């Protein structure tokens, strides 16, 4: 019997009307479902709250408190996280130190260090998760084929035609489904995944800055020890000369054996200092080699000097734009964004899950009829899932996500305070070391002047060589102190560059540390 167009219209209109009615009821029930009230959110601190002049605006809202404000709060966090778009400092910020050997080591480290490979792997994992989340938002289409040979029991509910007989059966079916995202579930899930992906991306930059800073610190420390060793070698020669002079004076009856023994005791002490410096230098060479992705003994011949290293003037103004470029702060901000979206996602679980499903295929008992016109099988309609009674599971999940958002906000606030402290410490140390260097330069000049005067008196026959050696002792002590202050100044410069995320854009007034 052929169906008329009117009959077909009536046949499909009835179930579609029922489906619309069910869908409307689901939306009504979903609108009545309440996730309850959440505790007040933690405030997200801004750079101005820690005493820095801000050039960007940061949000003070941590997470959503109602479904109507979820997207607004997430957008605010997104703008907060958009400070990540502030350009990072010069990628090769360590070049400001002016040592080509250090540049080579850092560049090798950034290409071969396993710790960076781990950060890149975490980024790849987050990217894959984002791709997977995106893939679930479109139509899902599948194709299945089931073939079986079955003997039907004689004592079951099968009709006599089947009972006790063996038949082949086949089912070839294509199916499709599409989730209707009326409540922002897909968007929240995608934004949460994107937040984690962006955090992982920025953490790669943070790992690069940290690696370069650690390598620069070790390099400066090694250069300091090399300088101190050179001074110690000169002290050894000077004390040997002092011992020789003392022995001669004892033989001449001008000094006692006590002075000779004192001079003899200074030699082993100086040699022990040199051995200690050699041991520390070996450890630093091993550290530099491993940081640059090499075997520990690869840099056993490395002996850098403080002379070529340069110290740059600090920025006149450290604003929020500088502090906000720190990769770890940017990553923490993205973690907050992801956590906020997780809260929004947990809230959507209270609303209906509505899908459109459909299938078309062939099904028959007996493979010889599988592809006949009468074996066709098709269907379509909505599928709805609505949580009604779950023992508080969804509310617990929502509160857990809200707590995780608070944890992310707290972690960001702690990181911001730590960053501000690191910058403040570096700035204060910079000024203190600069004042110490000025005073030490005067002390060194005075010691060198006294040494020159003692030498002139000795050459003029007005003084003895013992006075020259004694004056040189003060000069060597001041040179050791100068090396210490030089390395402290360079170390502090690296610390400030790392604290600001890798330097600053201001054109530095570069001066030698010598």
Predicted regions mapped to residue ranges:
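Periplasmic alpha-helical coiled-coil/stalk elements that build and connect Gram-negative outer-membrane
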Residues: 60, 186, 195, 202-318, ...
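Hydrophobic, well-ordered secondary-structure elements that form the walls
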Residues: 356, 384, 401, 408, ...
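Alpha-helical heptad-repeat coiled-coil segments that mediate oligomerization/polymerization in large
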Residues: 256, 419, 426, 464-465
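A short glycine-centered flexible hinge/capping loop motif at secondary-structure junctions
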Residues: 250-254, 458-462, 499-503
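Terminal intrinsically disordered/low-complexity segments used for targeting and assembly
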Residues: 2-9, 16-111, 170, 194, ...
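Small/polar-residue-enriched beta-strand and adjacent coil segments characteristic
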Residues: 34, 51, 60, 72-75, ...
């Amino acid at each position: 019997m052929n169906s008329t167009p009117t009959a077909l219209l009536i046949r499909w209109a009835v179930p579609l009307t029922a489906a619309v009615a069910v869908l409307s009821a689901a939306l009504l029930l979903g609108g009545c479902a309440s996730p309850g009230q959440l505790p007040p959110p933690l405030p997200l601190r801004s750079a101005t709250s820690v005493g820095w002049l801000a050039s960007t605006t940061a949000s003070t809202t941590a997470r959503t408190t109602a479904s109507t404000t979820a997207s607004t709060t997430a957008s605010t966090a997104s703008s907060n996280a958009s400070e990540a778009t502030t350009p990072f400092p010069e990628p090769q910020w360590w070049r400001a130190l002016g040592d080509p050997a250090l540049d080579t080591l850092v560049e090798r480290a950034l290409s071969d260090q396993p710790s960076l490979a781990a950060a890149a792997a975490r980024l790849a994992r987050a990217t894959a998760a984002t791709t997977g989340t995106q893939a679930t938002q479109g139509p899902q289409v599948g194709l299945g084929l089931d073939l079986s040979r079955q003997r039907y029991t004689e004592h079951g509910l099968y009709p006599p035609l089947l009972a006790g007989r063996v038949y082949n059966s086949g089912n070839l079916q294509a199916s499709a489904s599409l989730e209707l995202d009326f409540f922002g579930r897909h968007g929240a899930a995608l934004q949460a995944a994107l937040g984690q992906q962006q955090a992982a991306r920025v953490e790669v930059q943070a790992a690069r800055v940290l690696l370069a800073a650690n390598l620069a610190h070790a390099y400066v420390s090694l250069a300091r020890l090399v300088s101190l060793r050179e001074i110690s070698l000169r002290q050894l020669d000077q004390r040997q000369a002092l011992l020789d002079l003392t022995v001669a004076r004892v033989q001449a009856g001008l000094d006692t054996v006590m002075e000779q023994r004192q001079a003899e005791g200074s030699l082993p002490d100086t040699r022990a200092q040199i051995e200690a410096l050699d041991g520390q230098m070996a450890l630093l060479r091993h550290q530099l080699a491993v940081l640059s992705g090499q075997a520990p003994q690869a840099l056993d011949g490395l002996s850098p000097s403080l002379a070529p290293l340069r110290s740059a003037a600090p920025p006149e103004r450290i604003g929020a734009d500088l502090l906000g470029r720190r990769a770890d702060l940017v990553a923490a901000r993205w973690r907050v964004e992801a956590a906020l979206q997780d809260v929004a996602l947990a809230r959507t679980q209270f609303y209906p899950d509505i899908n459109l499903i459909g299938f078309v295929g062939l099904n028959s008992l007996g493979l010889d009829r599988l592809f006949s016109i009468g074996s066709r099988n098709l269907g379509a309609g909505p599928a709805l899932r609505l949580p009604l009674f779950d023992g508080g599971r969804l509310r617990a999940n929502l509160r857990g996500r809200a707590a995780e958002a608070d944890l992310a906000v707290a972690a960001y606030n702690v990181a911001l305070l730590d960053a501000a402290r690191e910058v403040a410490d570096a700035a204060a140390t910079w000024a203190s070391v600069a004042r110490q260097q000025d005073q030490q330069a005067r002390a060194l000049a005075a010691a060198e002047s006294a040494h020159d005067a003692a030498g002139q008196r000795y050459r003029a026959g007005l003084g003895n060589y013992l006075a020259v050696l004694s004056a040189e002792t003060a000069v060597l002590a001041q040179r050791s102190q100068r090396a210490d202050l030089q390395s402290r100044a360079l170390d502090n410069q690296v610390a400030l560059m790392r604290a600001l995320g890798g330097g600053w854009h201001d054109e530095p007034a570069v001066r030698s540390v010598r």
